[in-house]
């Protein structure tokens, strides 16, 4: 299947906030409660439709550990969108957002669209960060904001697609030079290998972790 545009995404945030689970829910529509800890960077892809145009999302899921931050930073370059994820049940993951955002702003292109995601919103009884706090952080830093649950799929589609809509709007407004692929946008040529292909998260050598929801 051909596509009009390809958008590159990066998913960032602390270890265990559910980055890999969000990707798996979006690409495969399934939840994996026990998930391999991401080592380095993993990859997924899916086709979506915006305004009647086929858009291919190419999504890089990064490791949250500090030891992999240098690898993660190299993927900021050439990303049109970023999903910055925290866990609403773990206050420290919210407190670390400023550091992640600083990294993104320092290493990414200045027009990258950033979606702030408060994940695991199904665990309301364990909530440690209010929705209002997430909204306020997003407002202060010019981010889009949603709360999601990779377990129930709540708002997962919306998180990825709304980010793409914002990128598409920037293209329409002339913000991006789409001939420059360093912006994380590639114009499609109707090639034969444009269909949704996913390298499923968890494949490859990794250590087991059950902290993903």
From Swiss-Prot:
It is a lipid-anchor. GTP binds at residues 13-21, 61-65, 119-122, 149-151. Keywords: Cell membrane, GTP-binding, Lipoprotein, Membrane, Nucleotide-binding, Prenylation, Protein transport, Transport. A lipid is attached at residues 212-213 (S-geranylgeranyl cysteine). NCBIfam families: small_GTP (TIGR00231). Protein transport. Probably involved in vesicular traffic. This is GTP-binding protein YPTC4. The lineage of its organism: Eukaryota, Viridiplantae, Chlorophyta, core chlorophytes, Chlorophyceae.
């Amino acid at each position: 299947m051909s596509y009009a545009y390809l958008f590159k995404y990066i998913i960032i945030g602390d270890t265990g906030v559910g980055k890999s689970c969000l990707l798996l829910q979006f690409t495969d529509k399934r939840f994996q409660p026990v998930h391999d800890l991401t080592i380095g960077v993993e990859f997924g892809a899916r086709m979506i439709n915006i305004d009647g145009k086929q858009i291919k999302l190419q999504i890089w899921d990064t490791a949250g550990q500090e030891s992999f931050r240098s690898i993660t930073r190299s993927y900021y370059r050439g990303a049109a969108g970023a999903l910055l994820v925290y866990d609403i049940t773990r206050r420290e993951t919210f407190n670390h957002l400023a550091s992640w955002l600083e990294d993104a702003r320092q290493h990414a292109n200045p027009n990258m669209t950033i979606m702030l995601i408060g994940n695991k919103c199904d665990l309301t009884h364990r909530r440690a960060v209010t929705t209002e706090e997430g909204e306020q952080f997003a407002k202060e830093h010019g981010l889009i904001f949603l709360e999601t649950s990779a377990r129930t799929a709540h708002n997962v589609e919306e998180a990825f697609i709304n980010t793409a809509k914002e990128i598409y709007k920037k293209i329409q407004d002339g913000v991006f030079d789409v001939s420059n692929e360093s912006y994380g946008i590639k114009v499609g040529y109707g090639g034969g290998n444009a269909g949704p292909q996913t390298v499923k998260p968890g494949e490859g050598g990794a250590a087991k972790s059950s902290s993903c929801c």
